[in-house]
A protein has these predicted regions:
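Helicase motor core with emphasis on the C-terminal RecA-like subdomain
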Residues: 1-183, 190-199
Length: 201
């Protein structure tokens, strides 16, 4: 705040809050198979009527689980980064306006989502980091006067999925050399260059 006041002549209003979310209740459940996970998810969703977010790690999982929930008579929609922008906006709007009770989403869902009545967040697979988990679980219980439940359903395959995804993001030595060669080639002609990652690729 001092920087903005001293350098930019702006007065900002400070909002402080306790970081402890005492209205959130955390539970971790081991489930040996995906079928066990799905039945547990169904039981959790059936035990409450509040809006719920189910987090998964892959777009296929979001689609598959949302579709299965709908076939079982629950009001669910998928949300992931591979969806067309209009479909994403529609799914989020329907969730925010309570036309859809359950959103099954990858981590692409949540930025800017402040829905006070989310009472259940289920991580169908473990999150890729503690920071992401805290942020995603924190979508529940935004109304501090209401209690909310946060569940993690996990099995041994969850970590393997994360290691596979992590390995897919690694650059090979050959790819690093190609990028380095492209940068050297461009800087040979100019002292300063401006280039996007797409141009280097």
């Amino acid at each position: 705040c001092d920087y903005f006041r001293d350098r930019l002549n702006m007065t900002l209003k400070r909002f402080t809050t306790d970081i402890a979310r005492t209205n959130l209740h955390y539970t971790v459940l081991f489930r040996a198979s995906d079928e066990d996970k799905y039945h547990t998810l169904r039981n959790l969703l059936d035990s409450t009527k509040c809006p719920a977010i189910v987090y998964v790690t892959r777009t296929k999982s979001a689609e598959k689980i949302a579709e299965r929930l709908c076939k079982d008579g629950l009001n669910a929609k998928a949300f992931h980064g591979q969806m067309e922008i209009n479909a994403k906006v529609k799914a989020q709007d329907e969730f925010m306006s309570n036309k859809v009770r359950i959103i099954v989403a990858t981590s692409a869902f949540g930025m800017g989502v402040d829905k006070s009545d989310v009472g259940l967040v289920v991580h169908y697979e473990i999150s890729d980091s503690l920071e992401n988990y805290i942020q995603e679980a924190g979508r529940a219980g935004r109304d501090v006067n209401s209690q909310a439940e946060c569940y993690v359903l996990y099995n041994d395959d969850d970590l393997n999925k994360h290691f596979i995804l992590l390995n897919q993001t690694k650059l090979t030595l050959s790819e690093i050399n190609q990028v380095w060669s492209a940068v050297k080639k461009l800087t040979a002609k100019h002292d300063t260059i401006y280039i996007s990652a797409l141009e280097i690729a």
